Amino acid sequence: SEKRAKGENDKIINKKVSSALKNNLKVIFCIGETILQKRKKMTKKILLNQLNKGLYKIKKKENILIAYEPVWSIGTGLVPKSEDLNHVISFIKIFLRNKMKFKNPKVLYGGSVSPQNISLLRKVINLDGFLVGGSSQNSKKFIDIIKKTFI
């Protein structure tokens, strides 16, 4: 999501995904909207566009995880409300199953994940895990997240 915000286009992202899969790598495909797009109620449209273009003609879907990473949330400490996050994750999974033929889509949350919000994020029922960014660079914070997730 951050790369898109800095100008990396969908065609380049699609080539990177294709190349990674051809080399038997797992892919975490990040999608997300900016704060302006969110305010304009464009989240679904933006996510569909990113999925359609970024995964265009991709075959090995079982090696892809999707990370919903709202650009407006990354590193800010701001997190979508649980019900909003649940709604977006459900929307992504339904689209992946029905339109992109994913058998069992896995969706991670990759906005601001921290020791302070991990307990709330864990309550989002259809979330399959987390893509931890800044907090993973601090061992104490990262261990705290792990403990609160698994213990």
Q: Residues of each region from the PLM?
A:
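Active-site loop-to-helix "anion-binding N-cap" substructures in soluble metabolic enzymes
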Residues: 1-151
